[in-house]
């Protein structure tokens, strides 16, 4: 058996678009067949049916009404599918044989804009990555706004991953020859759809990219930028099936002109979404984005993603914000006009894509109506930036007048249904409307006349697209119908429909005029659209100014509402913040509840602030606060503080919080070390680094050693010495102040009250004396038995009391089983035996363990001091359960002596010898 002719055509089309779900137009439905039908049925929960395709088995099939496609396509695209729309290219009534069909558009995650989406303030970016031996080229576009930009940089993987994290593309094009390891790394940081193409073949010509932009713009491209841009343009042509006139400016940018923030730091600082909810609420963007327009919202987001590092540019933006902040009436008038402006960028995108309707045109007109008042307002401005906006803002009065004269105030939604052109714009339209109106009046007169003639009051004249105009009479009035007056056309359950020759003649006149009118209005609308399309460059320029102006106005409004101050900007390596506040936490808990803190970082005595103190006390909040204030200053925003003097930072790095990568086979500690390694390799003397609890994912000695070494590396490396906030629970590190250059101790103030503590959340000079971990556990609601036992264990571990390892609570005793974990320089020894009844038996049990034998060379090394032995005997007499009392300090002392004896002084350089001596002295003091 062979496939039917229609199915043969379907299979040809499907083969060409094999990576897409094919929406195949059949009448009023889009149909999917075979695997596509199964996929769509599953993903959209549609009924799966079958269709005779000419084979023995029916082809799996599912379908959706064509008018409902807009509701279904986003769901597929958001799941990572591509959708190819195959339309009927001719009227089925006029077709000879199989109806001609063709794919008119491919909708992908990187090229789709959902008009009904709540994410209108977000960009939908499509990215191309081209990799040469030494360089990487990127091209990025949002086809809905017409943005198209490119950059290149040294072939360093982390730089590429950081840029992907910043741009957050929905779809990424890569060369099919790219390494799988790089693809895996990209997939590890983004959920974007990865599309592979052969860049040697999938690329537009040099002439095509020049036609899209200009010879001048293209001639300045280096090889990597040119190739990535040509590939990206090819993909846009392929998916849109046309050249988009709104993509008319090729912008080159340098990543070194913006602050570098890696993906991990963006996440930790919660710049655009919260860690917990993965939503805008709770992020810095949530605080700063009160934009009046969608364009302004995208601009605020872009500024947060790309802080400036050139002082003159920062101060220029700050000057605009400052003027809007200082003149409340100016900003209120400005925002009053801005709030009535629609998304001009995306309306222009619809014009370019031939997808604009009459209501979009009215939105454009309403937006342009506000430009004269905004221009007039800017004429009163004094700041350099606002003056530039005034000089460059095109009021677009010619376009506004065209729309004012041509588009009806309440047009049809579809441009193919008529009722879109305003009366008086075109004389032929006016004449046809009169003909149509007279025809409708004639129909109304006919209905009244027939009612009087027949005496049937319920008689009515109606219309539908199948039968045209008809006279409808209910069955109860059949006997009142004059014989021979009407011709029966249709029988219904409770009525009959009739026609007359006179009615059909008038129908032809009415419908003829209506059809002509609809076609004429459509033609006029496309002419208007094409006229405006020629002015896209002007529209985009004014839209860019409006979006930036909204960004400036919004930052001024936020500063006023939240009592922010204008920061001073310096390049001297000094960060001085007085009464700094965390912008997001303050917003959540309320200004009156938040405790402000001062911060001083410099390149002399306060290069690295070593912050100690308990959990829950506010260390992480404080550290993030400093980073966010710095970032806000560099986007040109006022900051939450009484005063701030911010040195420009080229990069912000954070290592905060615990996370693992189980899929990648990395533990929490491995991830932590990878992050620290990345920071130490890429930070510079102009960077701001936040390190929280480095080394906590391993044993105490290992963790302490790593944390210590990291601090030494940062402060001792002349090419690094970056401004650093270093929070730790290793209180031994406080002794580094005065020993290592630039280290300064700070802690979180705590107020003790009997058995409880109050965290004052105030950062003060000096190191913390306690961690208050048990108090935090108590605040968290742990049972009293657990808290009390923890205190007892703590006393034992600190050597202030004997430690009973058998006892779980003050009243319960473990049966005659004991598990003793002896930690010595990361070698863990576990003993699980019945309770030892004497010192000699305990030693024998220890000797039986191979791992412990390796750590201790002979039986003489296992000495239990007199205090422990006497205590054990005393406890044995008191308690028949034979519980063993151990003083764990003897293990630490023996380990310490062994470490001292094994130090090879001759193999150490002077710095290593000093460090070793300092560490051994510190450990010896603990064992007193």
From Swiss-Prot:
Start and end residues of each stretch annotated as Disordered: 854-880
Any one GO CC term of the record: cytosol
Stored InterPro entries: DNA_mismatch_repair_MutS, DNA_mismatch_repair_MutS-lik_N, DNA_mismatch_repair_MutS/MSH, DNA_mismatch_repair_MutS_C, DNA_mismatch_repair_MutS_clamp, DNA_mismatch_repair_MutS_core, DNA_mismatch_repair_MutS_N, DNA_mismatch_repair_MutS_sf
Biased composition (Basic and acidic residues): 854-872
Record-level Gene Ontology MF annotations: ATP binding; ATP-dependent DNA damage sensor activity; damaged DNA binding; mismatched DNA binding
Database matches in CDD domains: ABC_MutS1
Protein keywords: ATP-binding, DNA damage, DNA repair, DNA-binding, Nucleotide-binding
Protein residues bound to ATP: 613-620
Swiss-Prot/TrEMBL GO biological process terms: mismatch repair
Family statement drawn from the similarity comment of this UniProt entry: Belongs to the DNA mismatch repair MutS family.
PANTHER family according to UniProt: DNA MISMATCH REPAIR PROTEIN MSH1, MITOCHONDRIAL (PTHR11361:SF34), DNA MISMATCH REPAIR PROTEIN MUTS FAMILY MEMBER (PTHR11361)
Purpose: This protein is involved in the repair of mismatches in DNA. It is possible that it carries out the mismatch recognition step. This protein has a weak ATPase activity.
Classification via HAMAP family: MutS (MF_00096)
Protein name per the record: DNA mismatch repair protein MutS
Origin organism lineage: Bacteria, Bacillati, Bacillota, Clostridia, Eubacteriales
């Amino acid at each position: 058996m062979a496939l039917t002719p229609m199915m043969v055509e379907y299979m040809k089309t499907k083969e060409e678009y094999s990576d897409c779900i094919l929406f195949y137009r059949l009448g009023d439905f889009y149909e999917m067949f075979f695997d596509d039908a199964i996929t769509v049925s599953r993903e959209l929960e549609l009924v799966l049916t079958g269709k005779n395709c000419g084979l023995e088995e029916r082809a799996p099939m599912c379908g959706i009404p064509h008018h409902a496609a807009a509701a279904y396509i986003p769901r597929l695209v958001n799941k990572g599918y591509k959708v190819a729309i195959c339309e009927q290219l001719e009227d089925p009534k006029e077709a000879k044989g199989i109806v001609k069909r063709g794919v008119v558009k491919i909708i992908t995650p990187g090229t789709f804009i959902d008009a009904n989406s709540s994410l209108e303030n977000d960009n939908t970016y499509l990215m191309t990555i081209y990799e040469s031996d030494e360089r990487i080229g990127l091209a990025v576009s949002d086809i809905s706004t017409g943005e198209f930009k490119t950059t290149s940089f040294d072939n360093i993987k982390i730089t590429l991953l950081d840029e992907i994290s910043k741009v957050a593309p929905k779809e990424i094009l890569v060369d099919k020859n790219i390494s799988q390891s790089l693809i895996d790394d990209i997939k590890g940081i983004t959920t974007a759809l990865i599309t592979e193409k052969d860049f040697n073949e999938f690329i537009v010509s040099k002439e095509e990219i020049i036609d899209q932009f200009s010879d001048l713009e293209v001639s300045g491209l280096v090889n990597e930028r040119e190739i990535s841009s040509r590939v990206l343009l090819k993909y846009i042509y392929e998916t849109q099936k046309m050249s988009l006139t709104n993509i008319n400016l090729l912008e080159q940018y340098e990543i070194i002109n913006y602050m570098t923030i890696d993906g991990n730091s963006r996440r930790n600082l919660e710049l655009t979404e919260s860690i917990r909810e993965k939503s805008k609420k709770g992020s810095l963007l949530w605080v700063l984005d009160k934009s009046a327009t969608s364009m302004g919202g995208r601009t605020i987001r872009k500024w947060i993603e790309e802080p400036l590092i050139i002082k003159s540019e920062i101060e220029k933006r700050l000057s605009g914000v400052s003027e809007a902040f200082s003149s409340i009436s100016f900003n209120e008038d400005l925002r009053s006009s801005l709030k009535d402006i629609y998304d001009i960028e995306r309306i222009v995108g619809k014009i370019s894509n031939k997808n604009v309707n009459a209501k979009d045109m009215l939105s454009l007109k309403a937006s342009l109506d506000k430009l004269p008042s905004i221009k007039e307002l800017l004429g009163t401005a004094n700041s350099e930036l606002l003056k530039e906006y005034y000089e460059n803002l095109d009021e677009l009065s010619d376009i506004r007048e065209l729309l004012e004269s041509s588009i009806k105030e309440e047009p049809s939604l579809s441009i193919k249904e008529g009722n879109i052109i305003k009366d008086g714009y075109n004389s032929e339209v006016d004449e046809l409307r009169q003909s149509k109106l007279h025809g409708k009046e004639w129909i109304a007169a006919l209905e009244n006349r027939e009612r009087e003639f027949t005496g049937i009051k319920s008689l009515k004249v109606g219309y539908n697209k199948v039968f045209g105009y008809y006279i409808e009479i209910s069955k109860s009035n059949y006997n009142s119908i004059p014989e021979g007056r009407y011709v029966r056309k249709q029988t219904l359950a409770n009525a009959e429909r009739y026609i007359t020759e006179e009615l059909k003649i008038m129908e032809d006149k009415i419908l003829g005029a209506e059809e002509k009118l609809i076609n004429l209005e459509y033609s006029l609308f496309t002419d208007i659209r094409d006229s405006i399309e020629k002015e896209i460059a002007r529209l985009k320029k004014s839209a860019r100014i409006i979006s930036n102006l909204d960004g400036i106005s919004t930052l001024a409004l936020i500063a006023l509402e939240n009592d922010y101050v204008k920061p001073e900007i310096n390049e001297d390596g000094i960060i001085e913040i007085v009464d700094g506040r965390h912008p997001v936490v303050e917003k959540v808990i309320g200004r009156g509840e938040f405790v402000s803190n001062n911060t001083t970082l410099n390149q002399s005595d306060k290069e690295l602030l070593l912050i100690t103190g308990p959990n829950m006390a506010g260390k992480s909040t404080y550290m993030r606060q400093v980073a966010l204030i710095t970032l806000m200053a560099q986007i040109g925003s006022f900051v939450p503080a009484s005063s701030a003097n911010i040195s420009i930072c080229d990069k912000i790095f954070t290592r905060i919080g615990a996370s693992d990568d189980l899929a990648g086979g990395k533990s929490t500690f491995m991830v932590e070390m990878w992050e620290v390694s990345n920071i130490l390799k890429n930070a510079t003397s102009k960077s701001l680094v936040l390190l929280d609890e480095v080394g906590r994912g391993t044993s105490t000695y290992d963790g302490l050693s790593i944390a210590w070494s990291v601090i030494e590396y940062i402060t001792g490396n002349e090419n690094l010495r970056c401004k650093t906030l270093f929070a730790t629970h290793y209180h031994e590190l406080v002794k580094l102040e005065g020993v290592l250059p630039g280290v300064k101790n700070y802690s979180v103030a705590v107020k003790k009250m009997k058995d409880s503590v109050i965290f004052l959340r105030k950062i003060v000079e000096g190191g913390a004396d306690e961690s208050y971990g048990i108090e935090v556990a108590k605040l968290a609601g742990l049972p009293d038995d657990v808290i009390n036992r923890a205190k007892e264990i703590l006393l034992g571990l600190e050597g202030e009391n004997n430690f009973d390892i058998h006892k779980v609570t003050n009243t319960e005793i473990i049966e005659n089983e004991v598990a003793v974990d002896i930690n010595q320089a990361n070698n863990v020894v576990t003993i699980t035996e019945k309770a030892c009844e004497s010192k000699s038996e305990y030693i024998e049990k220890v000797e039986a363990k191979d791992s412990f034998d390796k750590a201790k060379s002979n039986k003489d090394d296992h000495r239990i001091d007199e205090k422990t032995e006497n205590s054990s005997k005393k406890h044995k007499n008191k308690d028949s359960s034979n519980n063993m009392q151990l003083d764990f300090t003897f293990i630490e002392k023996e380990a310490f002596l062994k470490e001292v004896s094994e130090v090879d002084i001759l193999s150490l350089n002077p710095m290593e010898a000093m460090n070793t001596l300092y560490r051994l002295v510190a450990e010896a003091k603990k064992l007193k």
